[in-house]
Amino acid sequence: DPTKPALVNPKNIIEAILNQGVTSMFASPALLNRVGEYGKKNRIKLPSLKRVISAGAPVSPSIIEQFSSMLCGDAEIHTPYGATEAVPIISIASNEILSETRKLSEQGYGICIGRPINDLEVCIIKVSDDPIDKWSEDLRVPDGEIGEISVKGDLVTRNYFGRPESDALAKIKDQDSFWHRMGDLGWKDSKGRIWFCGRKSHRVATENRTLFTIPCEAIFNNHPGVYRSALVGIGPLHRQKPVICIELKRHKIKYSKKTLKNELVGLAQQHELTQDIETVLFHPSFPVDIRHNSKIFREKLAVWAEKKLS
């Protein structure tokens, strides 16, 4: 069923690759996880594969490591970043992820998505939900500071069809050109790499500070019983209550949810990044997009969480 890549039979995918001598593969993170988990467990190798591309949602280093165990020679997994309005704009390969950026991702620095593609300009600008009429260098934030990822180049779409309100929110005029605001948050490191920290609309603004989804979720995802997590905010912006929603790994829970909840709250308190998160909710199966089964619908989870807590 192409609408459920997370439930694919890994044997069928592996058999097709081996029988047809497949050299290139594109897979969503959910499918990559499903096939990689089976392949690593059964020590399967895919010698014909020269490159694997995974996109549609952030690809965790653990999924990359898992699938890489099946690859041979100099074959790598590439995780390009982009959107319908501009794709691809940034990319990175598995060797750099596993050797350099993985540890930082698991410590809550975000997911490293790599460096800009040639002939594209990518910059990080101040976070704002308002339209920006004209470009100014004052919009840029210093390296290391989280802001909105913005891009300028020939492959970026100029406007939306019949949607001037969307144009105003996404496009910034810059003399004869323009910048496109991706709606994603991230920061740039000293090597020019971009680190993805989640959607701008998904950030959780409490009375004290702003929390970003991908960095915070990484802390909870380190727990062996957690399949994936999602940070949501309950209440009005700048007065939101942060709630971490947890989807557990199937068939691997050996203790009660009460015990697990206490462990997760304790884990949050160990990290400055997550110390404000005191509410944990368990969800049986996160709502995800039909194409990739990887993009978590945090808006739906926020509605669910609010009902659970009311």
State where each predicted segment sits.
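Conserved ATP-binding/catalytic segment of the ANL
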Residues: P131, S136-T213
